[in-house]
């Protein structure tokens, strides 16, 4: 028996080694052929804030890509996904070519009419996770100062008209365009490999997809790495004139003059969270410039950006996460990859240095996900009412794999945004929701005073 155990151990180790080698080969193949990676090596390291605000940074379109696609299958609304024929990338490629030939015209302003569009099988829907402004893509708008917001594209059978919807205000706008051809997008939608039945439910921040049945979602694995803290010091502060000071918790703060600093994690902690701060007295930028300026700071970090996407914008905050197989990845249970915060006296950029480097071939492991309505009902029993929920989505939670120090597993789970905080369902069920509610009521009372 002892001999057999060692023999089995040998083959297990050999299989793991072969899987890693195969992953490296696949990674090289993907890097040289997959459209997602076609722009690697063209990082916008030299992008200035002025270039970002003038919309001249090419990867503006790489970061601001719709992240979810919907279409109808046999009269039923489905979330569509195909890793090979990526609908959102195909849409973005065509919308970049589009040019507005008319002014933006509001055609819908009631919730009832808005929901008619949501449930109309004549449209494909390409959706951002949060609102962006009309002026972000100025070729679709004849005004550079239009801070009206939208989060949803409706693509009809025509290539000459595009509709933009705002889930929160129930407004739909029509723009006549030229230069785009969505025929391939429609073909991708018809033939999408993943078609998950959903219905859209209005929550605080818009319509979230509620999955109608229990699903077994794939667990993915990746080899990860992290840039050294010296890499970020060099990029963000420079190589000369930098001073440092270590606090009691082991964190070191590096400073360049009085205006710029970088807080790095304790090397022994295993943490990879950084905080970059630039002090400057200024007005908080308007909505469009917050989105554009955050692109500038993302580029300054020097993170790998091929799967990094705009994810959340609340007031003065703009956040980005990595999307893998169409699903957002949360770090440290519920953190975003990058979060920029604008204030009157500083700009803060909190970020994590993780890089999802090499995908491991799928081994068949899955995670069961309940129907969304059932999850919301369970949260209600723990005190988090549906009326408290701003958004609910399926996201990836990271778990370390014991077989290799750099190997992680991405576990599908429900994430909920409530009281302006993202947490997994498991986390919310352990929280004192009454305390959150009381704090919110206190803040509202003070605002009235």
Stretches with model-predicted labels:
Residues 231-275, 304-347, 352-354, 393-422:
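Exposed beta-strand-loop-beta-strand "reactive/processing" segments of non-cytosolic proteins
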Residues 361-365, 395-448:
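Extended hydrophobic
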Residues 4, 25-286:
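Preferential activation on post-signal-peptide N-terminal prodomains/segments
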Residues 279-316, 362-403:
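Short, non-transmembrane alpha-helical segments in secretory-pathway proteins
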Residues 1-8:
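N-terminal Lys/Arg-rich, disordered targeting/topogenic segments
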Residues 9-30:
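Hydrophobic membrane-insertion alpha-helices, especially the h-region
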Residues 140-163, 378-413:
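Amphipathic, soluble alpha/beta structural segments
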Residues 345-369:
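Short helix-loop boundary/capping segments
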């Amino acid at each position: 028996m002892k001999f057999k155990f060692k023999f089995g151990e040998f083959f297990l180790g050999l299989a793991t080694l072969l899987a890693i080698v195969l992953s490296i080969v696949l990674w090289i193949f993907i890097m040289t052929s997959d459209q997602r990676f076609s722009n690697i090596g063209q990082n916008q390291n030299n992008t200035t804030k002025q270039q970002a605000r003038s919309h001249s940074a090419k990867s503006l379109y790489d970061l601001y890509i719709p992240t979810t696609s919907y279409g109808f299958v046999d009269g039923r609304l489905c979330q569509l996904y195909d890793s090979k024929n990526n609908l959102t990338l195909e849409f973005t490629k065509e919308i970049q070519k589009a040019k507005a030939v008319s002014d933006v015209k509001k055609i819908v302003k009631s919730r009832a009419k808005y929901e008619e569009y949501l449930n109309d099988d004549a449209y494909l829907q390409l959706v951002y996770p949060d609102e962006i402004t009309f002026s972000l893509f100025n070729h679709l708008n004849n005004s550079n100062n239009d801070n009206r917001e939208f989060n949803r594209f409706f693509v009809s059978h025509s290539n000459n008209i595009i509709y933009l919807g705002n889930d929160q205000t129930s407004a739909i706008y029509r723009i006549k365009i030229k230069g785009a051809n969505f025929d391939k997008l429609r073909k991708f939608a018809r033939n999408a490999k993943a078609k998950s039945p959903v219905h859209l439910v209005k929550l605080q921040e818009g319509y979230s997809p509620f999955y109608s049945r229990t699903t077994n979602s794939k667990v993915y694995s990746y080899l990860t790495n992290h840039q050294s803290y010296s890499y970020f010091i060099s990029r963000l502060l420079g190589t000369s004139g930098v001073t440092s000071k270590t606090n009691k918790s082991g964190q070191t703060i590096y400073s360049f003059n009085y205006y710029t600093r970088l807080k790095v994690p304790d090397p022994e902690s295993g943490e990879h969270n950084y905080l970059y701060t630039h002090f400057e007295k200024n007005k908080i930028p308007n909505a469009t410039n917050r989105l554009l300026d955050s692109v500038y700071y993302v580029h300054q970090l020097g993170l790998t950006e091929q799967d990094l996407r705009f994810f959340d914008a609340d007031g003065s905050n703009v956040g980005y996460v990595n999307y893998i197989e169409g699903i957002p990845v949360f770090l440290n249970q519920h953190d975003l990859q990058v979060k920029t915060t604008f204030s009157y006296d500083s700009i803060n950029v909190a970020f994590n240095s993780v890089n999802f480097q090499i995908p491991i071939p799928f081994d068949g492991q899955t995670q069961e996900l309940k129907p969304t309505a059932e999850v919301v009902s369970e949260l209600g029993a723990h005190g988090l009412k549906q009326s408290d929920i701003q958004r609910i989505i399926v996201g990836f939670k990271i778990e370390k794999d014991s077989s290799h120090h750099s190997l992680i597993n991405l576990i599908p789970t429900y994430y909920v945004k409530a009281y302006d905080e993202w947490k997994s369902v498991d986390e919310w069920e352990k929280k004192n929701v009454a305390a959150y509610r009381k704090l919110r009521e206190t803040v509202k009372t003070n605002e009235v005073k």
